[in-house]
Amino acid sequence: MKKRISSIFCLLALAIISIQAKDYNVKDYGAIGDGKTLDHIAINATIDTCVAHGGGRVVLPAGTYLCGSIRMKSNVELHLMTGSKILAAPASMKAYDEAEEFEGTAYQDGGHTYFKNSLIYAIRANDVSITGRGMIDGEGLTR
């Protein structure tokens, strides 16, 4: 009986360990973090990989990540390590997703809403977070 209980606890411990969220380092997916190279494509690829494996933590180590639209998805924590910065790309770089067509009067300007045309956004997502001691610098981004 004691062996059976011990076996059950071991299996339970292994199950808990296997479902813990995994870290995905954006540099492993091509991000440079030099403040000159557009890194949102690599960050979005990291988020997609994270989601494909059930979610987890997308980690930005120290560096400056020049970015257009970052698309957050369910079960993803975007974690900015100390010394990391997401820096909004200038609008002239055309690195942002297209604004949505008019879908009502809320949050619209000139026939467009601006959820997708943002630095960081999520649509129909849950369990999304941005954590850490890094910085997000919108640079006074305008459309």
Which residues fall in each region the model found?
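Extracellular/periplasmic carbohydrate-active domains that bind, remodel
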Residues: 19-143
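Bacterial Sec-dependent N-terminal signal peptides
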Residues: 1-23
